[in-house]
């Protein structure tokens, strides 16, 4: 699988947004984390009697050795968010390159990945068909904006990069640190990519990523399909729910077998769990199957996906 090398250098990035005072980490609520970064919630003090909404601050993780790759990713993401405006993409609030490098963003309630984890911990039922369709609608619209208006590939679609407000009132796409440029045909624009290559997360990666095929805008559609599957299966793609191996007695041979298992599964369509009844989830299953076609051209565009999901939603409501 291709590895991320050097992010595309931002054209120009200045400190933007209002100046804020960041309290020590113990006074910040951790919202999440990623490779080399932490996302914290900043509760802003009222100003002139007005209540101000909280922010999400993405900062370099202090426990990780300083790395220019992580710094450059954060700068690339800030520059990109400053240029984007879409209701289904997390909003830019501020960026600072002073003593503490941070990106201030609109705060949302939870990531979809966290919501899935909570359902697993509480032994809950899968998400409803309407909730799955809402994710397909909102994130389909966000990807359509990225692919057509901005001409970029998200590059790391997965449940943890989808933010949800309330009971699926609105879903927003986040984490734009490893985007790639697309040409007018929706194909990875290598000439304008510098040294950047597809990054992604293996479990969600499309077949063309795993097997070295052509990267296009349809490469974002596959992992979105797997995200819809996650909402039904309540587990990450290709994980082994029936794995009862005792970790205390694992061996080199066990590790090798585990690696072989995942190498065989990555880039394939996972089976639908037996408890997902076709009558209740027919529309969600239709979208899942369309998004996870092995041949990229057979997958819907982000626009067509959102339109199909809206049609199915109108039938359910």
Question: Residue spans of the language-model regions?
Answer:
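Short beta-strand micro-motifs within the conserved protein kinase catalytic domain, predominantly
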Residues: 91-101
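Conserved short submotifs of the Hanks-type protein kinase catalytic core
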Residues: 99-111
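Activation segment signature within eukaryotic-like protein kinase domains
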Residues: 135-136
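Catalytic-loop of the protein kinase fold
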Residues: 147-165
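Activation segment/activation loop of eukaryotic-type protein kinase catalytic domains
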Residues: 165-199
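Conserved catalytic-loop aspartate of Hanks-type protein kinases
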Residues: 220
């Amino acid at each position: 699988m291709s590895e991320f090398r050097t992010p595309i250098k931002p054209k120009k990035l200045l400190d933007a947004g209002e100046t804020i005072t960041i309290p020590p980490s113990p006074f910040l609520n951790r919202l999440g984390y990623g490779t080399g970064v932490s996302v914290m919630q900043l509760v802003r003090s009222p100003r002139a009697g007005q209540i101000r909404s909280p922010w999400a601050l993405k900062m370099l993780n202090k426990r990780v050795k300083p790395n220019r790759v992580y710094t450059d990713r954060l700068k690339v993401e800030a520059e990109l968010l400053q240029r984007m405006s879409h209701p289904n993409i997390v909003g830019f609030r501020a960026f600072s390159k002073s003593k503490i490098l941070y990106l201030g963003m609109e705060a949302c309630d939870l990531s979809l990945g966290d919501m899935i984890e909570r359902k697993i911990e509480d032994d809950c039922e899968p998400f409803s068909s309407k909730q799955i369709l809402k994710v397909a609608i909102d994130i389909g619209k966000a990807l359509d904006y990225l692919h057509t208006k901005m001409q970029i590939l998200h590059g790391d679609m997965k449940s943890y990069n989808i933010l949800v407000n309330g009971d699926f009132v609105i879903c927003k796409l986040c984490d734009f640190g490893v985007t790639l440029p697309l040409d007018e045909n929706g194909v990875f624009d290598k000439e304008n990519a510098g040294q950047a290559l597809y990054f992604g997360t293996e479990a969600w990666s499309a077949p063309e990523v795993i097997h070295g095929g052509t990267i296009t805008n349809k490469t974002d559609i596959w992992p979105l399909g797997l995200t819809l599957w996650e909402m039904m299966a309540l587990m990450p793609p290709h994980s082994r729910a029936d794995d009862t191996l005792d970790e205390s007695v694992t061996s080199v041979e066990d590790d090798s077998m585990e690696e072989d298992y995942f190498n065989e599964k990555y880039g394939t369509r996972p089976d639908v769990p037996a408890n997902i009844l076709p009558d209740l989830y027919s529309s969600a299953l239709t979208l899942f199957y369309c998004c996870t076609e092995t041949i990229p051209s057979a997958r819907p565009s982000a626009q067509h996906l959102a339109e199909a999901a809206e049609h199915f939603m109108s039938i359910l409501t």
